[in-house]
């Protein structure tokens, strides 16, 4: 059996009772934290909560050694943990699919993720369009996909959730400031009037914690603001309902 379980967004207290129940029964627990990470806790605290040791896999081991993990699940009960929800990343979906192809029972235990946590903004979830990711620019690699996604969503009046790059192995987490700067840099190159310093944006920091940060304002005012510790995400609002306008006014710190 393969149990795919999410750990939630922030710390070990997000772990569900169902995950705790299965953790007691399984033979071995694996985890990965390169697609998302719990910034409010440590691996030791998670292990203490689950009362079992956890083998942490890096990106290469997850992407290239999944067959080994799946083979183990033929004869043993294996738990695979991720931050957030276990089925958000395509890599995790692939693991579940491959396991089912081999006739292995797969149990999926959902958990809070950024997709549920953005409800804290008061923006209507059905008005979000395609999600995009802003990554750290590298030599000869600076994808403009986020710009195109925002452009397409705005045409339809949709909000855009921008996830920010995580390089957990380097303990490098993109800030909202860096994400907004990247969007402006792409605009300067493309010059299609999609994003500017006058564009309004929302920043969510430390979603899932007891003290998340919610900030709203023009990009030119947000870009140098200190949003505190990560993780951050950015939302470019589309057409706003009057209730959403009230949410941005009263639930957010307006910069």
Curated annotation (Swiss-Prot):
Keyword Acetylation assigned: no
Catalytic activity: 2-[(3S)-amino-3-carboxypropyl]-L-histidyl-[translation elongation factor 2] + 3 S-adenosyl-L-methionine = diphthine-[translation elongation factor 2] + 3 S-adenosyl-L-homocysteine + 3 H(+)
EC id: 2.1.1.98
Pathway it works in: Protein modification; peptidyl-diphthamide biosynthesis
Residues binding S-adenosyl-L-methionine, per UniProt: 9, 85, 88, 113-114, 164, 207, 232
Function of the molecule: S-adenosyl-L-methionine-dependent methyltransferase that catalyzes the trimethylation of the amino group of the modified target histidine residue in translation elongation factor 2 (EF-2), to form an intermediate called diphthine. The three successive methylation reactions represent the second step of diphthamide biosynthesis.
NCBIfam families, alphabetized: dph5 (TIGR00522)
UniProt record similarity statement: Belongs to the diphthine synthase family.
UniProt name for this protein: Diphthine synthase
């Amino acid at each position: 059996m393969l149990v795919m379980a999410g750990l939630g967004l922030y710390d070990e207290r997000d772990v569900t009772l169902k995950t705790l129940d299965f953790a007691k029964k399984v033979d071995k627990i694996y985890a990965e934290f390169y697609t998302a990470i719990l910034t409010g806790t440590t691996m030791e605290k998670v292990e203490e909560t689950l009362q079992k040791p956890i083998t942490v896999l890096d990106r290469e081991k997850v992407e290239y050694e999944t067959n080994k993990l799946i083979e183990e699940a033929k004869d043993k009960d294996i738990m695979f943990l991720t931050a957030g929800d276990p089925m958000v990343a395509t890599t995790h979906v692939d693991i579940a699919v491959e396991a089912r192809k081999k006739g292995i029972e797969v149990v999926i235990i959902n958990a809070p993720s950024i997709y549920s946590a953005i409800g804290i903004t008061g923006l209507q979830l059905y008005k979000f369009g395609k999600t995009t990711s802003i990554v750290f620019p590298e030599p000869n690699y600076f994808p403009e996909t986020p710009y195109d996604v925002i452009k397409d969503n705005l045409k339809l009046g949709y909000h855009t959730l921008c996830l920010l790059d995580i390089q957990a192995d380097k303990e490098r987490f993109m800030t909202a400031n860096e994400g907004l700067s990247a969007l402006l840099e792409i605009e300067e190159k493309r010059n299609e009037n999609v994003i500017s310093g006058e564009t309004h944006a929302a920043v969510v920091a430390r979603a899932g914690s007891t003290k998340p940060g919610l900030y709203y304002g023009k990009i030119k005012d947000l870009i140098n603001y200190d949003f505190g510790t990560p993780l951050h995400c950015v939302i470019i609002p589309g057409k706003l309902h009057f209730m959403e306008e009230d949410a941005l006014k009263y639930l957010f710190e307006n910069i």
